[in-house]
């Protein structure tokens, strides 16, 4: 062992385990690349990103902290979102919430809407899980 060395288990890291997921289709209609970070309130993402914003209210990307998803001009891809946890307050970003999340606006997936939600993590099929690309 080397002084200061950290030895960890060689296992997969589970991100946002037991958080219900919502999958939405996103298209960059702008002329420049757009990146959205792991903790950004997706509802408030760049206006050039076209998607069902109401389904994104109160949610962020289901990716590891510090990662991001990049949308090149014209890109269209599915992303997986999860609800914020903790105190459920959102401040900053584009200033559209600045306080408590309005629970009545939060889309919660159910079995009757298979296009908006998945029961289990989509793993490698999920665009956001591919190294932030």
From Swiss-Prot:
The keyword Cell membrane does not apply. Pathway: Nitrogen metabolism; urea degradation; CO(2) and NH(3) from urea (urease route): step 1/1. Its EC number is 3.5.1.5. The keyword Nuclease does not apply. It comes from Staphylococcus epidermidis (strain ATCC 35984 / DSM 28319 / BCRC 17069 / CCUG 31568 / BM 3577 / RP62A). The lineage of its organism: Bacteria, Bacillati, Bacillota, Bacilli, Bacillales. It catalyses: urea + 2 H2O + H(+) = hydrogencarbonate + 2 NH4(+). Heterotrimer of UreA (gamma), UreB (beta) and UreC (alpha) subunits. Three heterotrimers associate to form the active enzyme. One of its GO terms (cellular component) is urease complex. This is Urease subunit beta. The gene is ureB. It comes from the Bacteria.
């Amino acid at each position: 062992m080397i002084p200061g060395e950290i030895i960890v288990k060689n296992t997969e890291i589970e991100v946002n385990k037991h958080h219900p997921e919502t999958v939405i289709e996103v298209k960059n209609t702008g002329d420049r690349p757009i990146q959205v970070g792991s903790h950004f309130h997706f509802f408030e993402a760049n206006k050039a990103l076209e998607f069902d914003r109401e389904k994104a209210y109160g949610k962020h990307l289901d990716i590891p902290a510090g990662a991001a998803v990049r949308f090149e001009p014209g890109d269209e891809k599915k992303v997986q979102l999860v609800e914020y946890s903790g105190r459920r307050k959102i401040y900053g970003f584009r200033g559209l919430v600045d306080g408590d999340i309005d629970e009545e606006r939060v889309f919660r997936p159910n079995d009757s809407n298979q296009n908006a939600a998945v029961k289990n993590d989509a793993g490698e099929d999920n665009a956001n899980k591919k190294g932030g690309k």
